[in-house]
Design a protein with these regions (language model features):
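Membrane-interfacial amphipathic helices
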Residues: 1-51, 72, 76-82, 258-332, ...
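Hydrophobic alpha-helical segments characteristic of transmembrane helices
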Residues: 1-16, 96-116, 141-150, 157-197, ...
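Bilayer-spanning, highly hydrophobic alpha-helical transmembrane segments
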Residues: 25-46, 63-71, 193-255, 289-300, ...
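Juxtamembrane/interface alpha-helical elements of multi-pass membrane proteins
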Residues: 56-151, 161, 283-287, 294-304, ...
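Hydrophobic alpha-helical transmembrane segments in multi-pass membrane proteins
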Residues: 126-127, 157, 161, 212-220, ...
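Small-residue-rich segments of transmembrane alpha-helices in multi-pass membrane proteins
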Residues: 275-277, 372, 572-574
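Juxtamembrane boundary at the C-terminal end of a transmembrane helix
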Residues: 581-591
Length: 591
């Protein structure tokens, strides 16, 4: 394993430098800029906390950051090379499907590579294919030798093995159709293994995330009790712990983006559909409503605070003249933000409904394309007559799209344009990509074979996606639990601090007695930050964490940005309710 890693690392440095794709000047400039930022941060820390800068632990931490920066600089070629390999692997299922379709349409191997080399949507994979096409067409290198040459240089092991098998098939005289028909199963099996491995990694990341969050929450609870143990203000420590929590969230998002298979639910075609225009319009209206609702909530803030306090007093059977030990105005801003952002549920809910329809269309598409391929193959190359019969069948949410496709073709709209409208209006990324392959291959090839290749691979990929949806659903409930727990622990800890402040605010203990007994909590009110600042810091941490948790769910499921807004608002409301429960329970305990 160690030898394999070292060999891959050596190959990464060699290929990056040979191809001149390691932009040394850019990386050096970025490193210098980051060094200046660290130096500026160090100076600010020196000015803000001069007593701590000379501490050996702080100095050691500074040197560790510098060493980490240097290590990152030298690791950049390896990281860039590995990222290219991962990008190629993520496109292999689409690549092999398209190759199978082109082979069924009786295109030569050279023509197939020429077509794929021009498809920039494949990114790094298209560049690797373009190398083969250039070697064959411009340098007159044999296809088998060109495949071996690129296989020795490509960062993807999956693609390298495929090229070696292709080279052997060319040498033995195996036809392109036979080879790519067998490769459908081989590549899809390997892709599925890697997909399952990635999803298992996601489960591990989720477990690590929960463990780290629990650890940070425990630290937050301990920090709230710091004034009772040492003569230190807990304000900076809560801010540092909250910053660590936010950094942890960002790191988890980065890791998920790198590990989770990169398919999206929604397509990214240039054509704007009615649904996309509705989403944009609803979002714009909801933003205006957010400002209006927030303005109203701020205007009624004093009345809101009064009536909430009154409601709690009535629930505790206390007269209105009794002063609450824990007034509600500390957490009113969190309530205002929750109410103010609630209008985002309107476009977000619409997006989630559309995503449910997209998933149902994805489930019906393989049956539709297989039926269409058989009908077209047995009649003619025209889609109109087969679609006329197929539109009578119930394909769920896909039925309307089939009807619209038939109507466009029947009025002599260009075939490619009609199918493009069909793919765009389904909103599905999978359908848009596989649909393009079907239309391209059906012009000259056997539509029955092509539809079988597409439907079989589509079913397998759609089945893999179900793992993502299930994992995202599980993580969503986990994120809600973390948000509720964080809100409860933070506000409960601050409530206890507040009660001790009230208890000891009139006490006067000599400093000598405090130092002799070690009871620093008698003087903590002089050393700690003001409570309003601590409350504000706490709910800011909660809001940022809820937003980042919603983005984590999006990273796993591949959904729309507006669907993450629904989860953000939901977690924000859950945190707000948790805060009010703490307040109510605290008043009950005091009474």
């Amino acid at each position: 394993l160690r030898t394999g890693f070292l060999d891959y690392a050596a190959k990464a440095y060699r290929e990056q430098l040979r191809q001149d794709v390691w932009p040394f000047e850019r990386f050096l400039a970025a490193t210098v800029a980051l060094g200046f930022l660290l130096e500026a941060g160090w100076l600010l820390l020196t000015l803000a906390f001069p007593d701590y800068i000379g501490d050996p632990l702080v100095v050691l931490l500074g040197f560790a950051l510098i060493l980490l920066l240097v290590a990152y600089f030298f690791m950049l070629p390896y990281l860039a090379y590995s990222e290219k390999g991962a990008t190629i692997d993520k496109e292999m299922h689409l690549f092999i499907t398209r190759m199978g379709v082109l082979a069924a349409s009786e295109a030569s191997r050279k023509e197939m590579f020429g077509i794929l080399a021009g498809m920039r949507e494949y990114g790094t994979l298209a560049k690797e294919i373009d190398k083969i096409f250039t070697l064959v067409s411009k340098w007159n290198v044999g296809l088998e030798k060109a495949c071996r040459t690129v296989a020795s240089q490509t960062p993807s092991e999956l693609f390298s093995n495929f090229l070696l098998r292709l080279s052997h098939a060319v040498e033995t005289g195996e036809t392109a159709e036979e080879f790519f028909e067998k490769e459908q199963t081989v590549i899809m099996d390997q892709y599925e293994i890697r997909y399952d491995s990635a999803m298992r990694s996601v489960e591990i990341i989720k477990e690590v995330f929960v463990v780290l969050v629990v650890l940070v929450l425990m630290i937050m609870v301990l920090v709230t009790f710091m004034p009772f143990l040492v003569m230190e203000s807990m304000g900076p420590w809560i801010a540092v712990t909250g910053g660590f929590m936010i950094t942890l969230d960002l790191l988890i998002i980065y890791v998920l983006e790198a590990v989770v298979p990169g398919e999206r639910i929604w397509h990214n075609m240039k054509m704007k559909t009615i649904v996309q225009k509705k989403i944009t319009r609803k979002f714009q209206y909801s933003i205006v409503m957010c400002f209006i609702v927030t303005g109203i909530m701020i205007a009624i803030w004093p009345y809101l605070n009064y009536y909430l306090d009154l409601a709690i007093k009535q629930a505790l059977f206390q007269p209105a003249s009794v002063e609450l030990q824990h007034p509600t105005y500390y957490i009113i801003p969190l309530l205002i933000l929750s109410v103010g952002l609630t209008p985002l549920l309107w476009p977000g809910g619409y997006v989630m409904d559309q995503e449910a329809d997209i998933k149902r269309r994805d489930g019906q598409y393989p049956a539709f394309i297989r039926s269409l391929g058989g009908s077209v193959g047995s009649r003619s190359k025209s889609f109109t007559l087969p679609l006329k019969k197929l539109r009578m069948h119930d394909f769920g949410p896909l039925k309307k799209n089939i009807d619209d496709l038939y109507k466009r073709l029947s009025v002599r709209i260009k075939t490619e344009r009609a199918w493009e409208y069909f793919a765009a209006e389904t909103q599905s990324e999978l359908i848009s990509k596989f649909n393009e392959m079907y239309v391209e291959g059906s012009k000259t090839g056997d539509t029955k074979k092509i539809s079988k290749i597409i439907s079989d691979n589509f079913i397998r990929i759609n089945g893999m996606r179900e793992q993502k949806y299930e994992s995202g659903s599980n993580f969503l409930w986990m994120a809600y639990g973390v948000a509720i727990t964080m809100s409860f622990l933070l506000f409960f800890g601050l409530y206890i601090v507040e009660q001790f402040m009230i208890l000891f605010k009139d006490m006067s203990i000599p400093t000598e007695a405090v130092q002799q007994t070690g009871l620093f909590f008698f003087s903590f009110k002089e050393s700690m930050a003001s409570l309003p600042v601590l409350w504000t810091t706490s709910w800011v941490i909660i809001v940022i964490h809820c937003a980042l948790s919603a983005l984590m769910v999006k990273s796993i499921t591949g959904g729309h940005r507006m669907s993450s807004a629904v989860h953000f608002v939901g977690m924000l409301w859950a945190s707000t309710i948790s805060a009010f429960v703490v307040m109510y329970a605290a008043q009950f305990l005091v009474v």
